[in-house]
Amino acid sequence: MKVSLPAFEKARVLVVGDVMLDRYWVGPTGRISPEAPVPVVKINQVEDRPGGAANVALNIATLGGQVQLAGLVGQDDTAVALTLGVQTLGVEPQWLSIADKPTITKLRVLSRNQQLIRLDFEEAFDKADSVRLLKQSEALLDSVDVVVLSDYAKGAIDQPRDFIALARSKGVMVLVDPKGSDFGRYHGASLITPNMSEFEAVVGTVTSEADLLEKARGLLKEHHFDAILVTRSEKGMTLVTANAPELHIPTVAREVYDVTGAGDTVISALATSLAAGADLPQACAIANTAAGVVVGKLGTSTVSRIELIEALALHHGESGFGVVSEDQLAYALEQAKLRGERVVMTNGCFDILHAGHVSYLKQAKALGDRLIVAVNDDASVKRLKGEGRPVNQVDRRMAVLAGLASVDWVVPFSEDTPQRIIARLLPDLLVKGGDYKIEDIAGGAEVIAAGGQVQVLGFEDGISTTAIIQNIMANQ
């Protein structure tokens, strides 16, 4: 599957659920305690990170989505720390403060990149607290496209069926990261994302792939879900819907350091992608890739858009050079700019590649680090040059160009001018051969407006594709 990132900045998501503070005490261990056979950790670093539903919200914000966050907290210093943690990424929380309950805190002691112990500070919230939170959140439904219910069984999401029904009636998708053995609580949700343990806690032991699909479809029918995405660790993910074949997405192989928050990353990437307009298979592939990134980090972490672009390019074959699609080139171009490389772009028909072309492309490449050549497809060449052209089909023209040492990427376009593709890619330098005026070069205005430059290069006199064709015909 070729995966394209949607415009995450268009995503509008509401996250409701169990928020918590993940606190880390970190330090070296050099000896065993004389009091008990346990290591002594000399703490030299303390770090607080938003966790649970708050981590989901931060993941969405890090990807570039617009996110609102609602959850239950205590009236304590931990709530203040949690608030500051989410506000650093522009997330303004809609807390419901409960006077007689602490803000949930999970304290982890780490040494040498290993977790030694976890201490939980929490008390379950009352059902009435959940009712008030969901009622408060109803007012936010008109301003979002997707709702995430992040359920850690701490009391924030107790009986959400009415809330789900209201959201669906407003055309808002509801995604649920479930907990517990009763998925009926989430009746009518658009999508639920159980891991394999959570799935089997509800349906029983899964004995085969066919058994998994049968049990998943049973849940779809029983609880009126649109889809179930089962996350399966090293086996990747399986998406099951009522009206389409199942989709198996293999895991993104990499070394796993910490699975903390991986489920948060999956549902946040799903929600952001769907809210930005991606279809469900694309959103699942993006979520799978994001999870592969986050398990390579220690502790509760987020995934940035750049990290996601790099991972997609690596695992979906979209970072290479040579002949590429426009979407593939967009990924590769972002990577190049991230590396600080200067990107040059030119365009043309290049019907019969000749010495003049080679010289021109060599000059263009010398002006930067990477060279893009956009090539007119066959239909546009015929419109521009007339009957009998092109002599060479676009695939052959691009293959020859890609073989030149000076050319990094070759991409086709179908319009008569390359203005649209240039405006999308926005190279650092746009070059054109011949006697053009800069203001007449297609795409030049867009490049200049974005801070780039436009330059005209000379062609070698006496050499042209038309002249070569005429010479061949004259000698027949």
Swiss-Prot record:
Oligomeric form and interacting partners: Homodimer.
Keyword annotations from UniProtKB, A to Z: ATP-binding, Carbohydrate metabolism, Kinase, Multifunctional enzyme, Nucleotide-binding, Nucleotidyltransferase, Transferase
Region annotation Ribokinase: where it falls in the sequence: 1-319
GO MF, one example: phosphotransferase activity, alcohol group as acceptor
UniProt xrefs under CDD domains: RfaE_like
Disulfide bonds listed in the record: none
NCBIfam families documented for this protein: cyt_tran_rel, PRK11316.1, rfaE_dom_I, rfaE_dom_II
InterPro entries to which the protein is assigned, alphabetical: Bifunc_HldE (IPR023030), Carboh/pur_kinase_PfkB_CS (IPR002173), Cyt_trans-like (IPR004821), PfkB_dom (IPR011611), RfaE_dom_I (IPR011913), RfaE_dom_II (IPR011914), Ribokinase-like (IPR029056), Rossmann-like_a/b/a_fold (IPR014729)
Keyword ATP-binding: yes
EC number per UniProt: 2.7.1.167, 2.7.7.70
One CC-aspect GO term: cytosol
Enzymatic class: transferase
Keyword Transmembrane helix: no
Record's catalysed reaction(s): D-glycero-beta-D-manno-heptose 7-phosphate + ATP = D-glycero-beta-D-manno-heptose 1,7-bisphosphate + ADP + H(+); D-glycero-beta-D-manno-heptose 1-phosphate + ATP + H(+) = ADP-D-glycero-beta-D-manno-heptose + diphosphate
Matches recorded under HAMAP family: HldE
The protein's name in its UniProt record: Bifunctional protein HldE
Associated pathway: Nucleotide-sugar biosynthesis; ADP-L-glycero-beta-D-manno-heptose biosynthesis; ADP-L-glycero-beta-D-manno-heptose from D-glycero-beta-D-manno-heptose 7-phosphate: step 1/4; Nucleotide-sugar biosynthesis; ADP-L-glycero-beta-D-manno-heptose biosynthesis; ADP-L-glycero-beta-D-manno-heptose from D-glycero-beta-D-manno-heptose 7-phosphate: step 3/4
Family: In the N-terminal section; belongs to the carbohydrate kinase PfkB family. In the C-terminal section; belongs to the cytidylyltransferase family.
Single GO BP term: ADP-L-glycero-beta-D-manno-heptose biosynthetic process
Residues binding ATP: N195, M196, S197, E198
Region of interest (Cytidylyltransferase), ranges: 345-476
Active site per database record: D264
Highest taxon in the source lineage: Bacteria
Role, per record: Catalyzes the ADP transfer from ATP to D-glycero-beta-D-manno-heptose 1-phosphate, yielding ADP-D-glycero-beta-D-manno-heptose.
